[in-house]
Amino acid sequence: MVVPLRGGSDKRSERWSHKMAVKTVSLRLPMQGNTQIENMTKPVTDALAGTGLLAGVVTVFVKHTTASVMIIEDEPGIRADTKAFWDRAVPADPAWQHNTRNAGEDNGHSHLRGQLQGPSVTIPFLDGVLLLGTWQQIVLVDFDTRSRTREIIIQIMGE
């Protein structure tokens, strides 16, 4: 059973009474679409380094419905497999309702891929270092059918 914390002399509430810093960075990244994968690990690491925070979490969020942020082993085989997977799992098809109900649209599959993968990842950090595994990299995947500039929000919460 979860019991809400109360003020006063409750030791648990005292432990959580300090304020946590929140830093937000916005990046704009030109992308080509067609399941393009762009490694975001360095920009995220750089944003974290600029805060001086030692422990907390970093959330990387893309402000678009036809792109996703994920963690992968970023190597050419996985990039090719990722594209092949999405092409098989959610193929481009002019019969998607988004395409048939909206004149000129051809990216219904792009929206569905974005929905399934999701717009964000959250990574813990300690001693100012992301706690990623040896082969884990943060990437942006653009599922759209055309080029556009994507906005990525990096929000860092910690102390």
Predicted regions, residues:
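Active-site histidine-anchored catalytic micro-motif
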Residues: V2-R6, K11-E159
